[in-house]
Curated annotation (Swiss-Prot):
Potential calcium sensor. This is Calmodulin-like protein 8. The gene is CML8. Pfam families: EF-hand_7. Residues 9-44, 45-80, 82-117, 118-151 form the EF-hand domain. Interacts with ZAR1 (via CaMBD domain). Binds to IQD1. Binds to ABCG36.
Length: 151
């Protein structure tokens, strides 16, 4: 995973959040501390779900989450939200009439602007490959799935 540079303000903010989880101030979040915070948010995770959360974040496998591990998680989440925002912006470029769907004509228009001369058949084929529900156009969820599968 590539490192995401966090600002000093972000690190300070994440340290404050970490301290909310770390009730006894020992520098690590235990399953019990995690449970307390999650339950305070009106969620009721099972013991297994709590252990799964810890295991996912706990890179040194000691059963707790230290601040460095918490920071890695937060950096990863920020990266994911940036990628989501980029996909939304890309979708808007294609969805000229902003109706929530990319039609064959909208796709063709964008491809021409990008210097790609596609036949109607090629454009239809591109729509067909991305159009999972078969309605003849590409909605945002289908667009995201298509973009993820490109990588």
């Amino acid at each position: 995973m590539e490192e995401t540079a966090l600002t000093k303000d972000q690190i300070t903010e994440f340290k404050e959040a970490f301290c909310l989880f770390d009730k006894d101030g020992d520098g690590c979040i235990t399953v019990e501390e995690l449970a307390t915070v999650i339950r305070s948010l009106d969620q009721n995770p099972t013991e297994q779900e709590l252990h799964d959360i810890i295991t996912e974040i706990d890179s040194d496998s000691n059963g707790t989450i230290e601040f460095a591990e918490f920071l890695n998680l937060m950096a990863k989440k920020l990266q994911e939200s940036d990628a989501e925002e980029e996909l939304k912006e890309a979708f808007k470029v294609f969805d000229k009439d902003q109706n929530g769907y990319i039609s064959a004509s909208e796709l063709s228009h964008v491809m021409i602007n990008l210097g790609e001369k596609l036949t109607d058949e090629e454009v239809e084929q591109m729509i067909k490959e991305a159009d999972l529900d078969g309605d003849g156009q590409v909605n945002y969820d289908e667009f995201v799935k298509m973009m993820i599968n490109i990588d």
